[in-house]
């Protein structure tokens, strides 16, 4: 059998795995008694008026990524990701989501500190809280000026969404190569 990376609940330990999001998606489906697409539409996409955001299906069409000059079409892999990466969006819609996430439009802002239990993960200098990442550079990595911390998430397929609390700055983007 497989051995765990550490005993569950060990202070300061975290291991990033997309399966955590998939499990959360399954729990949401059981509680709400709806499909994931309907849950996203009801609680996130429609309330935030995200016009270019959807849960990918096998028949979905969107821009390919490129490997050198070769386009790679990936709706099958993205549609199979579900809660762990099956959302397709634009940088603009991702910005709306990010600002809403940190301003209390999705849930009370008082819940945010509960997500900030930072643990080191394998991708230094990234740390992981509950569902979100933090990047906090050491002075060794940023010797000329202190780099402010950013919190948010990087996506599996070339997207990122981060918030810099000390500057009240929101950063989103997408890449396809």
Model regions and ranges:
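Short, surface-exposed loop or secondary-structure junction motifs
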Residues: 1-151
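Short, small/polar residue-rich loop motifs at catalytic or cofactor-binding pockets
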Residues: 155-157
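Short acidic-glycine loop/turn motifs at beta-strand connectors
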Residues: 136, 164-167
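Short, well-ordered beta-strand elements
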Residues: 167-177
């Amino acid at each position: 059998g497989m051995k765990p990376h550490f005993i569950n609940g060990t202070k300061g330990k975290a291991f990033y795995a997309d399966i955590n999001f998939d499990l959360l998606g399954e729990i949401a489906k059981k509680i709400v008694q709806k499909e994931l697409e309907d849950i996203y539409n009801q609680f996130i996409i429609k309330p935030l008026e995200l016009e270019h955001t959807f849960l990918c299906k096998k028949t979905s069409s969107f821009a390919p990524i490129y490997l050198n000059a070769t386009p790679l079409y990936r709706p099958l892999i993205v549609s199979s990701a579900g809660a762990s990466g099956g959302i397709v969006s634009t940088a603009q819609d991702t910005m709306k989501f990010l600002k809403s996430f940190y301003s209390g439009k999705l849930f009370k802002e008082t819940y945010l500190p509960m997500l900030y239990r930072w643990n080191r993960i394998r991708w230094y200098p990234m740390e992981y809280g509950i569902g979100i990442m933090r990047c906090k550079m050491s002075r060794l990595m940023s010797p000329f000026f202190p780099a402010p911390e950013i919190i948010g998430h990087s996506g599996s397929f070339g997207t990122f969404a981060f918030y810099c609390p000390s500057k009240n700055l929101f950063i989103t983007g997408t890449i396809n190569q």
